[in-house]
Amino acid sequence: MNLISTSSIFTGILMGFVSYLSAAEWKKHTVVPAGKGSINGVSASDFDEDGQVDVITSVGGEVILLKGPDWKRFPVHQFVKGLARNKPRLACIHSCLMDVDGDGDMDFIGSNQTVFWLECPDNPFSGTPWKYRTVDDEILGTHCVVTGDVNRDGKLDLIANSFRDPNSTRFYNSIVWLEVPKKPHEATSWIRHVFADKDAPGGSHYMGFGDVNGDGRPDIASGAKGTQGFVRGQWFAWWEQGEDATKPWKKHLLATDEETPSNAIGKL
């Protein structure tokens, strides 16, 4: 599939449709009223399979599920100390959905000082907290989590960046893909593969996933800002997957000296 996409689906959808339809043809519906805190990621799915789309996000120290169409709020997780080695903040910096355990429903994946997943239960709106499990608590500065079948085994993997410095993590200036373990309910972490091994300096951000060179193997693209203390950023690049997806990939620079690049998205 010659397509590069990111989990920033709402941005992509809005950009595409706004160029086609006038603003007057769109009606705004408020799902979460304005208030304290920021919302950095929103995902949609019919979690209870009632035919209505629901929304999940994080804000104000919790992950919340909003049941469509009236958007009643159901907290499903509280960010508290002690669940991971890193103290969480009030909200995820990025998130996405993925059926981690193959049970047919969408689980929540978030990055909040730790990359984690919440298991969607049989009754997601029961009021019972969703089970929290760690994906990776050693990569740091993860501002993007996006899914894709990296090794072409028919199962989705997770792609995440780790832009913190050597004093913070041994996976500094890197981007990884994470393979779901055979027993995800029992595993303490996922299987990490570092494909951009210390050659993604600066503040790497949202990744694109697709077969750039048409060799049948999916590649990964990213951009990195270089302001606000991020050293050697301001670039766009893509990494070419080799025959062994678990080994470091070959980096190809697309552009340098770019002003605050963060997204790599397009159709080839």
Predicted regions and their residues:
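N-terminal secretory signal peptides that target proteins for export/translocation
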Residues: 1-6
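Beta-propeller-forming repeat regions
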Residues: 21-268
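Bacterial N-terminal signal peptides
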Residues: 8-19
